[in-house]
UniProtKB/Swiss-Prot annotation:
It is an enzyme of class 6 (ligase). This is Glutamyl-tRNA(Gln) amidotransferase subunit A. NCBIfam families: gatA. Gene3D superfamilies: Amidase signature (AS) domain. PANTHER family: GLUTAMYL-TRNA(GLN) AMIDOTRANSFERASE SUBUNIT A, TRANSAMIDASE. HAMAP family: GatA (MF_00120). It comes from Leptospira borgpetersenii serovar Hardjo-bovis (strain JB197). Belongs to the amidase family. GatA subfamily. GO terms for biological process: translation. Keywords: ATP-binding, Ligase, Nucleotide-binding, Protein biosynthesis.
Length: 485
């Protein structure tokens, strides 16, 4: 591996600013690393070397003339394949969009380009972001760099694996029910799900519009802080975008007097995850924090509520992919109805079809009130329960995932078990609050374990402060693999 990629994110940012390395050198190192290990990891669906190197060359020219766009000018970043980049294929890892080239940039892409970031698309994902393992991609299964027989998490598995394998220092993903936090946990990274509405969704191909949110990955907390500061902000093109106070610097917590909400561990949780969680809690208690065990019994139905709402929105959002408005066309008989059926049957994978059917059922005339209407009422109760929690505690700490990375193929035939991987993440999306996954050590096999920190709406600054303090605790650092494959 090129020595440049052994530098931390902070060192890379400093080296670019001081001229110790050029953007072209850094981009070339990333390309070489991708060629070296991605045959095994399969984090990227394509690699446009010319476009990457051209962007890096432009960055170098700006720095040489003394006019860098920002301190980030020349920094490479991987982009998930559901975030639109003009004149680049945005397939959402689906055959139905296999040849779709976006005619416009997503808002987050415009913001990254305005700061001089070097974009490296297209990071693999579960098809249309529907999955928790990146096994639902129509093109390839991404592997966990820590163990190639295991999954990296999903749906943003390609983004997470690319950072964990040191192919890129940063990445963007999307999080609908845990799709940034869960792969961050399984790949030993920091992964942020911002408050809903603080980051524009314009140009993010929608899965479930009331739940989707774009978020960053990094090996270091500072990478997430920097990316959030760049991509957040109100956007008139996104009707759900909000004005928010932002933050000037991460809040520095004093553990003495800090009230931290915790969750009771059960026998269903991997013992090593429980051990790591309790170790963190004990360290926080020793530093003066007060631990408050919260009653999460009302969240037992969070996953079914999530899957009713998410699949309902998915069935609506994906109706546009019919072979006429969007998507590849399969016209065997010349009949309009057959065109719709054939295009969608051949274009969508099995998990996408399953969720479309579930959503269509819950929205049907005879069942709308019983399912979708009831789920929306229950969603309000979840939001109120979080409000109640945060009147008692400053933060809530939970393991991000109940297990470390499982083996490829282990849960593909049991969707219920796969859905349970998001047991602690979906409720955060239902409530629209921010959460971040931070590394919490490893299990006996060396597989990463993640800790989810949750805060009230718009409290990203405090969330980063808590993540910074917890990240400084003993024995939580992750050693990332260099020799892969």
């Amino acid at each position: 591996m090129n020595e440049i990629l052994r530098k931390s994110y902070a060192e890379l940012k400093s080296s670019l600013s001081l001229g110790k390395i050029s953007a072209t050198e850094l981009a070339t190192a990333c390309i070489e690393r991708i060629k070296e290990v991605d045959g095994s990891v399969k984090a990227f669906l394509s690699l446009d070397e010319k476009r990457i190197l051209d962007a890096a060359s432009e960055s170098d020219a700006r720095r040489k003339s003394g006019n860098p766009l920002s301190e980030f000018d020349g920094m490479p970043i991987a982009i998930k394949d559901n975030i639109c980049i003009r004149d680049s294929i945005t397939s959402c890892a689906s055959k139905i969009l296999e040849n779709y080239k976006s005619p416009f940039h997503a808002t987050v892409i415009e913001k990254l380009i305005a700061k001089g970031f070097v974009l490296i698309p297209r990071a693999n994902m579960d098809e249309f972001a529907m999955g928790s393992s990146t096994e639902n991609s129509a093109f390839q299964t991404t592997r966990n760099p820590f163990d190639l027989e295991r999954i990296p998490g999903g749906s943003s598995g390609g983004s997470a694996a690319a950072v964990a394998a040191s192919m890129v220092p940063l990445a963007l993903g999307s999080d609908t029910g845990g799709s940034v936090r869960q792969p961050a946990s399984l790949c030993g990274l920091y992964g942020l799900k911002p408050t809903y509405g603080t980051v524009s969704r314009y140009g993010l191909v929608a899965y479930a519009s009331s739940l989707d949110q774009i978020g960053p990955f990094s090996k270091e907390l500072q990478g997430c802080i920097d990316l959030y500061s760049v991509i957040s902000g109100k956007d008139e093109r996104d009707s759900t975008s909000l004005n928010h106070p932002g933050f000037s610097a991460p809040w520095t917590p004093d553990f003495k007097g800090l009230k931290i909400g915790t969750i009771k561990m059960t026998s269903e949780i991997q013992p090593e995850v429980v051990k790591a969680y309790e170790k963190v809690l004990n360290q926080l208690k020793e530093k003066g924090a007060t631990l408050v065990e919260l009653d999460f019994s009302k969240f037992d139905f969070a996953i079914p509520i999530y899957y009713i709402i998410a699949t309902a929105e998915c069935s609506s959002n994906l109706s546009r992919f019919d072979g006429i408005r969007f998507g590849s066309r399969k016209d065997k008989t010349g009949k309009l109805e057959d065109l719709f059926v054939d295009s969608r049957t051949t274009g969508f994978g099995s998990e996408v079809k399953r969720r479309i059917l579930l959503g269509t059922f819950s929205l049907s005339a005879g069942y709308y009130d019983a399912y979708y209407g009831t789920a929306q009422k229950a969603r309000v109760l979840i939001r109120k329960e979080y409000d109640s929690f945060f009147s008692k505690v400053d933060f809530i700490l939970q393991p991000t995932s109940p297990t470390t990375a499982f083996k490829v193929g282990e849960k593909t035939k049991d969707p219920i078990q796969m859905y349970k991987a998001d047991i602690w993440t979906t409720s955060v999306n239902l409530a629209g609050i921010p959460a971040i996954s931070v590394p919490m050590g490893t299990d006996e096999k060396g597989l990463p374990i993640g800790l989810q920190i949750t805060a009230p709406h718009f409290q990203e600054g405090k969330l980063f402060g808590a993540a910074q303090a917890i990240g400084a605790l003993e024995d939580l650092n992750i050693k990332f693999p260099e020799n892969i494959g």
